[in-house]
Amino acid sequence: MILKSKICGVSDTKILNFIVNHDHPPQFIGFIVNYPKSKRHVDIKILKELMKIEKKNSFYVAVLVNPNQNILEEIKEMPFDYYQLYDCQPSKIQSIKEKYKKKIITAITVRDIKDVNDYRKFIETTDIYLFDSKGYENSMSFD
């Protein structure tokens, strides 16, 4: 198994510069694009500034909760390598993947072990799976 690391919720240029210039940066750096309930949500104006920072050896990830066409169009020219999608059906994910030519991280919300098996629905559309707890903005744990 190949393990990858991701830091998510980056919203400050100073912190992002530190991360990308670290001797051992994470493979993925996530930016919460369209979920204002999260205290780590990044306003689009700040996001544009963050995207000016060279990612070097990391991949930039747009974290999106059931994104609408407006937000997808607004970020399409930004240098994201992956879109991490929450609360999307496989058909919507496939459509986003084809239209925007991005790799996809499908986030599967886990309440219990049955939810883990949901990954099977996304086999055709997903490049990476991320299993996350319910309550995105609350950083809740799960068994």
Where are these regions (language model features)?
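Conserved N-terminal beta1-alpha1 strand-loop-helix module at the mouth
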Residues: M1-F142
